[in-house]
């Protein structure tokens, strides 16, 4: 059998074998068997050198044609198998539109946010408007305008985070309370009456415990006008507590001291966790302080642009986290900043 006849036979055999290659692995094996360096076509090409010189051109041309035919057939088979694989993957990934859909996860408001919105609603119905004030304050607004000049001993009531500033610049700090917002609200409204609440974050360098955090929310409130008395303050706070905790809630006022109010009081609610029996949250007193309050000091009124001979006013500052602890029965304020979904999903 001549070399050309052998090439014809090999070509037919290879094409027939290619038709039976069912996947890309089989194609790779076929390519190695027929077109590889040690494949059938390469072995047959070694006989070209033994042919007479006049037969070599025709045999060489047939050899090249056979290789081209097999390579083209391989490319077509490979493309066809890849298309089939893609189609199979597409069909396997198809979505059954008759299946019920998956509802997106529904988020929840943080308990502090819920409490803040409740406070806004209750006090908003009493005529208080929400104001915002800076979290980074000057020493002047955080202390001096609130009747605490430099070296005043009352400054020790707040462990303060100070901000580094250039020499000659005003002293900056992270506000220790929302009370500086009083001055902004007063100066924007004086000499007219004003009722405002000022919510926001506060910062104090304190040891973190079940009752205290270094960062916490506070809501400041002020009411200024003619003939406003302590009775108005008491009525406002009691009405607020009854709206928030129910008509039967037990409350009490205790004398206290704040440099920006005179007289000053603490407003307590009976501990809901222990029913007044005493627990670690209420320090075994049976009561939990939720806010401090008092009549605005005349000096603060003057700094806000009001004449204390003509008007008076009261102020209060409450902690939404502590109030939420009472409302939801939470025994540790650290849960509010834990980010633990097991805690947050309960609200």
Swiss-Prot record:
Cofactor: Mg(2+)
Catalytic activity: tRNA(Phe) + L-phenylalanine + ATP = L-phenylalanyl-tRNA(Phe) + AMP + diphosphate + H(+)
Major location (coarse): cytoplasm
SUPFAM superfamilies according to UniProt: Class II aaRS and biotin synthetases, tRNA-binding arm
Sites where the protein binds Mg(2+): 262
GO CC annotation, single: cytoplasm
Enzyme Commission number: 6.1.1.20
GO biological process, one term: phenylalanyl-tRNA aminoacylation
Subcellular location: Cytoplasm
Keyword Lipid biosynthesis found: no
InterPro entries in UniProt: aa-tRNA-synth_II (IPR006195), aa-tRNA-synth_II/BPL/LPL (IPR045864), Phe-tRNA-synth_IIc_asu (IPR004529), Phe-tRNA_ligase_II_N (IPR004188), Phe_tRNA_ligase_alpha1_bac (IPR022911), Phenylalanyl-tRNA_Synthase (IPR002319), tRNA-bd_arm (IPR010978)
A GO MF label: ATP binding
Highest taxon, organism lineage: Bacteria
Entries under Gene3D superfamilies matching the protein: Bira Bifunctional Protein, Domain 2
Cofactor binding note of this UniProt entry: Binds 2 magnesium ions per tetramer.
Subunit composition and interactions: Tetramer of two alpha and two beta subunits.
Family: Belongs to the class-II aminoacyl-tRNA synthetase family. Phe-tRNA synthetase alpha subunit type 1 subfamily.
Name of the protein: Phenylalanine--tRNA ligase alpha subunit
Provenance organism: Roseiflexus castenholzii (strain DSM 13941 / HLO8)
Lineage summary: Bacteria, Bacillati, Chloroflexota, Chloroflexia, Chloroflexales
Name of the coding gene: pheS
